[in-house]
UniProtKB/Swiss-Prot annotation:
Gene transcribed to yield this protein: rplX
Superkingdom to which the source organism belongs: Bacteria
SUPFAM superfamilies: Translation proteins SH3-like domain
Protein name: Large ribosomal subunit protein uL24
Record's function text: One of two assembly initiator proteins, it binds directly to the 5'-end of the 23S rRNA, where it nucleates assembly of the 50S subunit.
Native species: Chloroherpeton thalassium (strain ATCC 35110 / GB-78)
Keyword field: Ribonucleoprotein, Ribosomal protein, RNA-binding, rRNA-binding
Gene Ontology biological process terms from the UniProt entry: translation
Origin organism lineage: Bacteria, Pseudomonadati, Chlorobiota, Chlorobiia, Chlorobiales
Coiled coil residues, start to end: none
MF term (GO), any: structural constituent of ribosome
Length: 81
């Protein structure tokens, strides 16, 4: 374990259904796609969408602007059964 980083037990895990209880997306439900226990953050499907600018590649010769989910704090979600 690195200095200054504590491993925190998360109340949710990947593929759990959760509901956002605070923030801009309050009331939205979705599935957890990824968990970051060291930062106490989660990525929820369809929540906290942000635009990412991609530079030109073989896949995107002109470059692209993609919408992706960004992490939110785990305390802002509640598990839904």
């Amino acid at each position: 374990m690195k200095l200054g980083i504590k491993k925190v037990k998360m109340h949710v895990k990947k593929n759990d259904m959760v509901k956002v209880i605070s923030g801009n997306d309050k009331g939205v439900s979705g599935k957890i796609l990824r968990v970051f226990p060291e930062k106490n953050r989660v990525i929820v499907e369809g929540v906290n969408m942000r635009k990412r600018h991609m530079r030109p590649t073989q896949e995107y010769p002109q470059g692209a602007i993609l919408e992706r989910e960004m992490p939110i704090h785990a305390s802002n979600v509640k598990k839904v059964s």
